[in-house]
Amino acid sequence: MCTSRQIIGSLLVLSVLEIGLGLSSVAVGAVTFFRVRMEQKPQLGDSSPVWSGACFLICGVCGIFCAKKKSGLIMILFSACCICGLIGGILNIQFLRALNKRSSSLYSLYLASMSLACIGISGCTISTWLTCRLASYEQRRMFLEREHSLHHSHEMTEKDTENITNGGGPLALNGRV
C-alpha cells in the first residue's frame, strides 16, 4: 500500500506534467489556429486545443495546491478540475478528428494536438484516482486520530472513576481533605 508521501509525490509529478501538457497544447493550438486563419476560414473546433490546454493547465495548478494543502475542499476542487480536463481533452480529440477529415494540410499539427490531449486525458484520469486515494488515506488518518483521542479520554475517565471508587486516597476539595 502506498504511503501518503508517495501519493503526494506522484500527484506533484503528474501536476507538473499536466502544466507542461497544458502549455504545449496551448502553444500548438495557437499555431494551428493562426495557420488555419491564413489558409482558410476558421471553423468550429479550431481553437479546441487552446481550450483543452487551458483545462490541463488549471488541472495542474490545482494539483499542486492539492498536494501542498490536503484539505477536503481543495481535493474536491482538484477532482472537478480533472473532470473538466477529461471533458476538454475528449472534446478536443472529437473536434480535431472532424477537422482532420476536411483539411489534410494541417495533419501534423492536428496529430500533435490529439497526442497531447491523449496524454492529458491519461494524466487527469490518474490524478483523479490518486486524489481519491489521498482522500481515503486522510479520512483514515483522521478517524484513527479521533479514535485515539476518544480512547485516551475514556482511559482518563476510567482512571478518575477508579480512584474515586477504590479508595484512591482522600479527595481534596478547596484544599481540605
From Swiss-Prot:
Membrane topology value: Multi-pass membrane protein
Region (Disordered): 152-177
Localization of this protein: Cytoplasm; Membrane
Residues making up the signal peptide according to the UniProt record: none
Bias (Basic and acidic residues) ranges: 152-162
Principal location class: cytoplasm
PANTHER family (UniProt xref): TRANSMEMBRANE PROTEIN 196
Name this polypeptide is given: Transmembrane protein 196
Annotated organism of origin: Xenopus tropicalis (Western clawed frog)
